[in-house]
């Protein structure tokens, strides 16, 4: 086996391991956790020796005073003085660190708000149009790099394929709080501005096509890229996001 093939296999195995860790984490019930000794970076600036405490569902307290950290931990049933999970400086970032019901020492690592992405088509060689497995791997790739929530962008395809892809996104949302919904980039694009989209699949947004997509989405459609200059483009701008009654 060539060296490049071996490296590719190792990469795929590493990605699958991380995706499995994400699956396990999402399947577990929410539990309190805390992170301490982090370098916090957000819109307010940079702060050293920062900590965060969550009850499992929401952040309940943040700060940089040790006494306040102990009190915040106690409020969610954690002991700030127990041995904590550690994030070593040599950690490659390819594994999820810490655990539910734990106190994690960030060892000076950076802590930022989770990113929310509203336009990306995939990651790690997988597309959000590639079904449940494709979404699973692509979301793991984004999650590893800090995107905690995401609107999944779907490209122009035959209408029945786009409807099926919307149904897949809708079906995953109940078990995947990290999936915020779907973004349709197409099929209602101008031929002159189509980019890499298949021109054979581009359509004018007549009510029939719009209703089919809305029905398939089941309420998961968050945004759609359209060309308002199309014959029915302006009409689409005034369309309710809920499908019309049959």
Regions found by a protein language model. Name each.
Residues 3-75, 84:
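N-terminal metal-binding scaffold of metallo-dependent hydrolase/deaminase domains
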Residues 76-79, 107, 165-176:
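Short amphipathic alpha-helices and their capping/turn segments at secondary-structure boundaries
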Residues 121, 136-165, 178-191, 217-231:
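Divalent metal-dependent hydrolysis catalytic cores, especially in the metallo-beta-lactamase
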Residues 139, 166-170, 210, 237:
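Generic structural signal for well-ordered alpha-helices
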Residues 190-215:
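Conserved phosphate-binding/catalytic loop of the ribokinase/pfkB sugar-kinase fold
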Residues 205, 218, 231-237:
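Acidic, metal/ion-coordinating pockets
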Residues 238-246:
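Single conserved hydrophobic/aromatic residue that forms the stacking wall/gate
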């Amino acid at each position: 086996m060539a060296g490049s093939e071996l490296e590719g296999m190792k990469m795929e195995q590493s990605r699958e391991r991380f995706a499995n860790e994400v699956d396990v984490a999402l399947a577990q019930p929410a539990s309190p956790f805390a992170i301490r000794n982090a370098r916090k970076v957000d819109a307010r600036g940079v702060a050293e020796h920062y900590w965060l405490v969550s009850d499992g569902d929401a952040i309940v307290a943040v700060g940089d005073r040790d006494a306040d950290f102990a009190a915040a931990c106690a409020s969610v049933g954690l002991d700030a003085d127990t041995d904590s999970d550690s994030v070593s400086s040599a950690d490659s970032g390819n594994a999820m660190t810490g655990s539910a019901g734990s106190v994690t020492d960030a060892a000076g690592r950076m802590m930022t708000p989770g990113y929310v992405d509203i336009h990306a088509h995939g990651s790690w060689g997988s597309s959000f149009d590639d079904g449940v497995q494709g979404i699973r791997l692509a979301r793991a790739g984004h999650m590893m790099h800090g995107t905690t929530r995401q609107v999944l962008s779907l490209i122009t395809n035959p209408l029945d394929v786009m409807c099926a892809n919307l149904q897949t996104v809708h079906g995953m949302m109940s078990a995947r709080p990290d999936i915020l919904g779907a973004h349709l980039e197409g099929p209602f694009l101008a031929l002159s501005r189509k980019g890499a989209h298949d021109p054979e699949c581009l359509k004018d947004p007549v009510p029939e096509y719009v209703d089919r997509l809305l029905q398939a989405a089941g309420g998961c459609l968050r945004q759609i890229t359209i060309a308002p200059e199309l014959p029915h483009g302006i009409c689409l701008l005034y369309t309710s996001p809920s499908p019309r009654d049959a």
